Design a protein with these regions (language model features):
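C-terminal alpha-helical cap/extension of soluble enzyme domains
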Residues: 59-62, 66, 75, 83, ...
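Catalytic domains of carbohydrate-active enzymes, especially glycoside hydrolases
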Residues: 8-29, 82-83
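Active-site-adjacent beta->alpha loops and helix N-cap segments on the catalytic face
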Residues: 12, 31-52, 66-71, 91-111, ...
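Structural motif
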Residues: 20, 49, 82-83, 136-137, ...
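Ordered, amphipathic secondary-structure segments that act as subunit-interaction surfaces
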Residues: 74-91, 95-98
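A short, Lys/Arg-enriched amphipathic alpha-helix followed by its capping loop at the start of a domain
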Residues: 2-4, 16-23, 208-211
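Conserved, mostly hydrophobic/aromatic
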Residues: 17, 79, 118, 142, ...
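Hydrophobic faces of well-ordered beta-strands that scaffold small-molecule active sites
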Residues: 2-8, 25-27, 54-60, 87-89, ...
């Protein structure tokens, strides 16, 4: 069955996503930086506001460089202590390749938690070579658009990547409703939206009706 994952910034977003029928949340802060690690307080508020699974972003700066690994490990530990059981992460090295060492170092702090490797894959030198690396790192999901330019440009790559699962392919990054039938036909079962369920932009909350419209598209 297809799933819809919705980006949430706070409890209000989480409640609207659940009411609209979403299946999972990606919890982040600071979308101006493309999504950073949320505070412990925000995580607790969201966890208390919804029954949906919550994947929490582990990233401390815009882009796909590792940043402060010690800080990220501390944040991961603190989030786990607060009850987080699912995460989102993934890094590139200075040469544009998947940073296996840093990723595995942080994953070690998760101790078996489910996690998504996020769109660093799209920004790597070769998405197919990178997929082969990422699938050895222990994630159960890869968030990708197939291209750094977004889903519209990456449709061909996505159709090839979904055939190489596992891990599961979660499509997001400029995803629009008109992409859904073609992706479903190719075997994609995971869809990820953010601004698409915020008609008034990132400064406004998730709209329940928009989430419901997306969920209905997946049926």
């Amino acid at each position: 069955m297809p799933i819809l994952e919705v980006i949430a910034l706070n409890a209000k977003d989480a409640e609207a996503a659940q009411e609209g029928g979403a299946h999972r949340l990606e919890l982040v802060s600071d979308m101006a930086s493309d999504g950073l690690t949320p505070s412990i307080a925000t995580f607790k508020e969201v966890r208390n506001s919804t029954d949906l699974p919550i994947r929490v972003m582990l990233r401390d700066a815009k882009g796909f460089a590792p940043g402060n690994l010690k800080q990220l490990r501390r944040q991961a530990w603190e989030l786990r202590e607060a009850g987080a059981t699912e995460f989102v992460l993934g890094f590139l090295d200075a040469g544009g390749e998947i940073d296996e060492g840093v990723t595995l170092n942080l994953v070690a702090e998760l101790e078996g938690c489910a996690w998504t490797f996020h769109r660093a894959l799209d920004n790597s030198n070769d998405v197919f070579r990178s997929w082969g690396i990422v699938k050895t790192l222990g994630c159960d999901t890869v968030l990708a658009a197939g291209s750094p330019k977004g889903v519209e440009d990456g449709l061909g790559n996505l159709k090839e990547l979904v055939a190489q699962a596992p891990p599961a392919l979660l499509v997001g990054g400029g995803l629009q409703q008109h992409h859904v039938p073609e992706l479903l036909a190719a075997g994609v079962t995971g869809f990820h939206v953010g601004s698409a369920v915020r008609p008034a932009g990132w400064e406004s909350p998730v709209e329940m009706a928009s989430v419901r419209e997306w969920v209905n598209r997946l049926v």
